[in-house]
């Protein structure tokens, strides 16, 4: 959600400008989140957390996830919508999908052409679910007003037009890089090893049918 707020208020750009010796308030007029529409693509654990924070900021939330029921989406504050409805009506779009053969370049030229002019785009999920070259084209044309990326098709990115674009906020895959998150991961690993050794249920296995 920090990416969303930074994107809405041009915080990194304004910081760099001030540190560069400028006092240029007029160039960094942002937008408020209240009353804006955010499209949350992927309503798993992280997507639901984003929905709840968006509701707290009085945003209208459209959610897309083919595996979530309308009742479930409504229960945590999202209006379940088709991907077309999300693209056409959202001021902000944030993606929270795994990278699979079905989701690779889930957002590309065709999908971006359906968006509102000036849409703000966020990817803190997985590199590759958004076509970076398509985003650069959309930024250059003004179709996308700004973007925030924490993940990339190539990590670390090399000579990336996306990273170097003036209207892109980017961080080096920091989504889970908090002290608390790292401690929690270690605890979960230890708990799961204990469960396996005591013949209890195996959770989150990627190689069990």
Segments from the language model and where they lie:
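Hydrophobic "lid"/C-terminal helical patch
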Residues: 4, 90, 139, 189, ...
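Glycine-rich Rossmann-fold phosphate-binding loop(s) that bind the pyrophosphate
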Residues: 43-44
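Gly/Ala-rich phosphate-binding loop of Rossmann-like dinucleotide-binding domains
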Residues: 51, 55, 139-140
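Short glycine-rich hinge loops at helix-strand junctions in the catalytic core
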Residues: 58
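Rossmann-like adenosine-cofactor binding region
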Residues: 62, 66-161, 177
């Amino acid at each position: 959600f920090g990416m969303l707020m930074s994107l809405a208020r041009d915080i990194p750009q304004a910081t760099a400008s001030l540190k560069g010796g400028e006092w240029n308030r007029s160039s960094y007029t942002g937008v408020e989140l209240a009353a804006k529409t955010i499209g949350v693509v992927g309503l798993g654990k992280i997507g639901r957390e984003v929905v709840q924070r968006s509701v707290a900021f009085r945003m209208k939330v459209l959610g897309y996830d083919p595996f979530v029921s309308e009742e479930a989406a409504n229960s945590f504050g999202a209006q379940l919508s088709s991907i077309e409805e999300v693209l056409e009506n959202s001021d902000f779009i944030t993606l929270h999908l795994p990278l699979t053969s079905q989701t690779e370049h889930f957002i590309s030229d065709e999908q971006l052409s359906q968006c509102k002019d000036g849409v703000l785009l966020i990817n803190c999920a997985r590199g590759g679910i958004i076509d970076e070259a398509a985003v650069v084209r959309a930024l250059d044309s003004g179709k996308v007003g700004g973007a925030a990326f924490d993940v990339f098709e190539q990590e670390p990115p090399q000579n990336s037009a996306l990273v170097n674009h003036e209207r892109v906020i980017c961080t080096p895959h920091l989504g889970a890089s908090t002290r608390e998150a790292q401690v929690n991961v270690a605890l979960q690993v230890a708990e799961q090893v204990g469960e396996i050794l005591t013949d209890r249920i195996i959770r989150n296995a990627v190689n069990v049918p």
